[in-house]
Amino acid sequence: MMRLRSWLLGSLAVVLLAAAQPQAAPRLKITLSNQEWPPYMGKELPYDGILSRLVKEAFARSNVDVAFRYYPNNRTLQSARNGTVDGSFGWAPTPERKQDLLFTQPVLHARMVFFQRRNASFPWNDLSNLRHARVGVTVGNFYSDEFNRQVKAGHLIPDMAPDDVTNLRKLLAGRIDLFPIDMEVGQYLIARNFQPRLAQQLEPQNKSFWVAPLHVVIWRKHRQGPELVERFNRGLKALQDSGEFDRIVAETRAASLAYHKPIKAQ
């Protein structure tokens, strides 16, 4: 009888101990829209690019599997805002975007600069100094509150294009004077889309006009939206605290820079 009682007490203790342990969050699967923004994002890049890999790794640490669905630039964010996909990433917050999207902690920051032709520089101390400059703008992108204020005031003249490479071609042809883009992305696109004799005609300004935070966004009406944001933030912190974040950035950047396709004759 004593043996039975001891066995029952032991079994009860095991059950109570198991119940007291925190349960692992159930595994979730989500789809995020992606686009071509190398070396941070890109379908043919190793790991889909630096930012794509960081997003996947951070979610994985919180039991979330991520699949990517690629869209043209001007449809990437819209697909998240209307719920076609669960979310997207690589976006800075604006009041308009916050109406439809939940924002995580920033993953990386983009150093936004103006690219120009080497033979036509545009120095400035304030964006209002660029009065009447023709500035290429990619449809769907946000270039800071100050940039928008200068456009509204008529100090900057926006010239729209569907993607960044088209804007760089327009800059090379003299159809625009300046093109704002992340320093690393601009240099990557120029090196991989233009012959050296053309690439050397374009240069970035040294001064950045904005350091843009790049967030993951989740459709605001998603029934697990707040949970997904919390899981991502937790996974991102774990990635950063472990030192894996910096290792992944360095490894993926090196792999992305080593990757290239032949440039078509121009």
Map each language-model feature to its residues.
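Short helices/loops that flank or line small-molecule/ion binding pockets
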Residues: 74-86, 102, 129, 165-192
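Bilobed "Venus flytrap"/periplasmic-binding protein-like clamshell domains
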Residues: 39, 45-57, 118-153, 167-169, ...
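A ligand-binding cleft/hinge motif common to bilobed small-molecule-binding domains
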Residues: 78, 91-99, 178-200, 207-210
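Acidic, polar ligand-binding/catalytic clefts
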Residues: 68-129, 140-143, 203-208
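Extracytoplasmic small-molecule ligand-binding "clamshell" domains
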Residues: 24-95, 99, 251-255
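Ligand-binding cleft/hinge of the Venus flytrap
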Residues: 55-64, 105, 129-131, 140-162, ...
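Extended ligand-binding regions for polar small-molecule ligands
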Residues: 52-61, 215-248
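A bilobed periplasmic-binding-protein/Venus flytrap-type ligand-binding module shared by bacterial periplasmic
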Residues: 113-123, 211-226
